[in-house]
Amino acid sequence: MKYADILLPVPLEGFFTYAVPERLREQIAFGMRVLVNFGPKKTYIGIVVRTHDEEPKGYKTKDIIDIADSKKQDR
């Protein structure tokens, strides 16, 4: 399983880890904007800050919904 840490525009510190669905695994990369669910009803566009294979402990991850752009954002 592949995971991505996502920076979201919310007033909370840190990144949020999401599972990368099989259909997006070859495309997802640092700096891309992605569409994710946050909480029970919110959907946000966030930025991928890291991809990895480390399963988070203590909670079940949500899947990334889709990629918002076709290219990475510059730093």
Predicted regions and their residues:
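Accessory, non-ATPase domains that flank or precede helicase/AAA+ motor cores in DNA-metabolism machines
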Residues: M1-R75
